Amino acid sequence: MIEADRLIQPTALREDEVIDRAIRPKMLADYTGQDHVCEQMDIFIQAARKRSDALDHLLIFGPPGLGKTTLANIVANEMGVSIKTTSGPVLEKAGDLAALLTNLEENDVLFIDEIHRLSPVVEEILYPAMEDYQLDIMIGEGPAARSIKLELPPFTLIGATTRAGSLTSPLRDRFGIVQRLEFYNIKDLTQIVKRSAHFLELNLDEEGAMEIAKRSRGTPRISNRLLRRVRDYAEIKANGEISSDVASAALDMLDVDKEGFDYMDRKLLTTIIDKFMGGPVGLDNLAAAIGEERDTIEDVIEPFLIQQGFLQRTPRGRIVSQRAYLHFGYDYEPN
């Protein structure tokens, strides 16, 4: 779908992975933003280390691109243990999970991204592992099949999800710590852009960093991606100097406006205004009208628009706010 080509999509692109790993903070002291989360995690980690215990199982949720994977790796680094990483869709069979669990050392971290996509059979195996550090596996088939219990070392499961509401209650209830990551403010994003520019050895001033931050939709992954594209523009058009004017010109060229909107954001909002009189409009109708999938609209496009007050989800459907009308130069006539 069109979402896969978006410069400002918050999900990771292949080009992001290598650079993001290089500039990713390794410890809580280097982590910018999410102050409340960091303060709590610092206390929980120090307490667990003082007792020589595994950290309680941790669930991290929030929109994509906000640093869930980064935080999971920081937790492992702060605890001084190894981390094994996988994702819900990869764990197709109970044996896939069993292989990971039986290779964990004491107090290690197992990180499962997209944990809401675990299959029911794998999830069932996870319950006793999380609660009692035991693995129940079946040996044999048919009438000769029998269950055996394997003892596991104490470990920490860190689950990450963009859809906390999709987790089953039994799984959600087994996490001792639950943290929600919020969209970043411009001040914190500016610091992230400056830190990334330092690692990339770029000539970027404060105003240039802030201009990139303002258009990053509250998402560090987007900030870093926009920074790389602005770098390309500056190398050709401005001798590598990234000022506010250079950043603004580059992002205008890339079709990312002052609010961080791209073509898909504008299409969604203006479609509701032009074709559905500002709403309400149901999700299925909206998806058909803009040619995008329901999940992409719900998980990728809408969260930032709702958080910024341009769009509302109501029981009757999606409604565009007065702010959206004014942003696009429409006369506002409440429905």
From Swiss-Prot:
The keyword Nucleotide-binding belongs to this UniProt entry's keyword annotation: yes
UniProt entry keywords in alphabetical sequence: ATP-binding, Cytoplasm, DNA damage, DNA recombination, DNA repair, DNA-binding, Hydrolase, Nucleotide-binding
GO molecular function annotations of the record: ATP binding; ATP hydrolysis activity; four-way junction DNA binding; four-way junction helicase activity
GO cellular component assignments: cytoplasm; Holliday junction resolvase complex
Residues noted as binding ATP in the record, renumbered to the chain: I23, R24, G65, K68, T69, T70, E131, D132, Y133, R174, Y184, R221
Positions contributing to DNA binding: R294, R313, R318
CDD domains: AAA
Superkingdom classification of source: Bacteria
SMART domains linked to this entry: AAA
Region annotation (Large ATPase domain (RuvB-L)) ranges: 4-184
First-tier enzyme category under EC: hydrolase
Pfam families with a match to the protein in the record: AAA_lid_4, RuvB_C, RuvB_N
Record-level GO BP terms: DNA recombination; DNA repair
Catalytic activity from the UniProt record: ATP + H2O = ADP + phosphate + H(+)
Region entry Head domain (RuvB-H), spans: 258-335
UniProt region (Small ATPAse domain (RuvB-S)), positions on chain: 185-255
Subcellular location as annotated: Cytoplasm
Sites where the protein binds Mg(2+): T69
Enzyme Commission designation: 3.6.4.-
Subunit structure, as described in the record: Homohexamer. Forms an RuvA(8)-RuvB(12)-Holliday junction (HJ) complex. HJ DNA is sandwiched between 2 RuvA tetramers; dsDNA enters through RuvA and exits via RuvB. An RuvB hexamer assembles on each DNA strand where it exits the tetramer. Each RuvB hexamer is contacted by two RuvA subunits (via domain III) on 2 adjacent RuvB subunits; this complex drives branch migration. In the full resolvosome a probable DNA-RuvA(4)-RuvB(12)-RuvC(2) complex forms which resolves the HJ.
Domain note: Has 3 domains, the large (RuvB-L) and small ATPase (RuvB-S) domains and the C-terminal head (RuvB-H) domain. The head domain binds DNA, while the ATPase domains jointly bind ATP, ADP or are empty depending on the state of the subunit in the translocation cycle. During a single DNA translocation step the structure of each domain remains the same, but their relative positions change.
Database matches in PANTHER family: HOLLIDAY JUNCTION BRANCH MIGRATION COMPLEX SUBUNIT RUVB, PTHR42848
Family, as annotated: Belongs to the RuvB family.
Job description of the protein: The RuvA-RuvB-RuvC complex processes Holliday junction (HJ) DNA during genetic recombination and DNA repair, while the RuvA-RuvB complex plays an important role in the rescue of blocked DNA replication forks via replication fork reversal (RFR). RuvA specifically binds to HJ cruciform DNA, conferring on it an open structure. The RuvB hexamer acts as an ATP-dependent pump, pulling dsDNA into and through the RuvAB complex. RuvB forms 2 homohexamers on either side of HJ DNA bound by 1 or 2 RuvA tetramers; 4 subunits per hexamer contact DNA at a time.
Protein's name in the database: Holliday junction branch migration complex subunit RuvB
